[in-house]
UniProtKB/Swiss-Prot annotation:
NCBIfam families: bL25_bact_ctc, PRK05618.3-2. Residues 13-24 have a biased composition (Basic and acidic residues). GO terms for biological process: translation. GO terms for molecular function: 5S rRNA binding; structural constituent of ribosome. It comes from Leptospira borgpetersenii serovar Hardjo-bovis (strain JB197). This is Large ribosomal subunit protein bL25. Pfam families: Ribosomal_L25p (PF01386), Ribosomal_TL5_C (PF14693).
Length: 212
């Protein structure tokens, strides 16, 4: 498992809103943001370069972020939505929502693998099928990514959702019990097995004749 890394960024409060004010902010190197909690939205602005660095570091919906809000102190949040300009790679607006300790939320958790599957060394093909899952859990048990060790997977083996080692508070929101990773036989391996079986068949027939 991979514990959530807390990213930090300063937020300057703003009282003026609207299209013109947002454009003015962007031209000065700031990006408008909203902090949502208990049905109330607080308007603010963050440094564009710092925000872009944080976003490009690979944050997810499950990434815990600590905002240092002007006049309000530190607030822990998650990203609700990142809006971008469609024609250029630039952030337009970000919505954050406040963390409420003990209150369950629904978010997405990435699944990563570590190690080299044993079966892939003997002709099998490793497949990573599910890369992300939706989870309902409390903020205290959130992980940025779920890492599973596939070292012991041999040809024909697989890891299903029900076999994942996750915190007790997690409710994985998915239908059935699908396969997350597996090691399957390649066409070459299947062909080799068929050829071996055909080669053994005449020998078996001769052995049976000799017994008569």
């Amino acid at each position: 498992m991979s514990q959530s890394t807390i990213h930090k960024i300063a937020v300057k409060k703003r009282t003026e809103t609207g299209k013109n004010e947002n454009n003015r902010l962007r031209s000065s190197g700031m990006i408008p943001v909203n902090i949502i909690g208990a049905g109330v939205a607080t308007s603010g602005a963050v440094n564009e370069k710092e925000l872009a660095k944080m976003v490009h570091s690979g944050i997810r919906q499950s990434t815990l972020i600590e905002l240092d809000v002007e006049g309000q102190g530190q607030q822990k949040v998650f990203v609700k939505e990142i809006q971008r300009f469609p024609e250029i790679d630039r952030i337009r607006h970000v919505d954050f929502y406040k963390v409420v300790p003990g209150q369950k939320i629904v978010t997405k958790i990435g699944i990563e693998t570590t190690g080299v599957a044993k079966g892939s060394k003997t002709g099998g093909q490793f497949e990573h099928i599910i890369h992300e899952i939706r989870v309902k859990t409390i903020p205290e048990d959130l992980l940025e990514n779920l890492t599973i060790d596939v070292t012991d997977l041999d040809v024909g083996d697989s890891i299903k959702i029900s076999q994942l080692k996750v915190p007790a508070s997690w409710e994985i929101l998915i239908n059935g019990d699908p396969i997350v990773t597996s090691v399957n036989k390649t066409k070459a391996l299947l062909a080799a097995e068929r050829a071996e079986a055909k080669g053994a068949a005449p020998d078996d027939a001769k052995a049976k004749k000799g017994k008569k």
